[in-house]
A protein has these predicted regions:
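ATP-binding Walker
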Residues: 16
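Phosphate-binding P-loop
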Residues: 1-5
Length: 133
């Protein structure tokens, strides 16, 4: 199989700095970060619809993307997903481990290489960061 596209999948716990690290790397390397779809209806402190890591949609809109979904995660009260086209159009994808597993399964016959980057932060630091959110 000839690889036609490489996607750097960034994984880590909430608050580990995945978005910060990924956005800076993408900026320095002139690469793009995939903004996955999310039915999460709240914005975090300092977040707007424009600067969010996600494209915020209503639960009613999910079905129209169903045939093109490549990584779907059902969270507590909302879901996140990306489409095949988004994957092909971007270089980095910030994704949780459950979504990454599905992504691996659904891309095994595609000419895409997935490179995993884990962002690890001590639990004590995660706790501090969570209190600031």
């Amino acid at each position: 199989m000839i690889i036609i596209h490489t996607v750097y999948c960034v994984l880590g716990r909430t608050g580990s700095g995945k978005s910060t690290v990924t956005k800076e790397a993408a900026k320095q390397l002139n690469m793009s970060v995939l903004r996955s779809y999310s039915t999460r209806q709240y914005l975090r402190q300092g977040e707007t619809k424009e600067n969010s890591d996600h494209i915020l949609i209503s639960p009613d809109e999910v079905e129209k993307y169903r045939n093109d979904m490549i990584a779907y995660t059902d969270r507590v009260g909302y879901c996140n997903f990306a489409t095949k086209q988004q994957l092909l159009d971007n270089d980095f994808y910030i994704i949780n481990p459950t979504g990454y597993y599905e992504l691996k399964l659904k891309t095994k016959d595609m000419d895409i290489e997935l490179v995993t980057i884990m962002v690890n932060v001590p639990f004590s630091e995660l706790r501090k960061r969570a209190k600031k959110r």
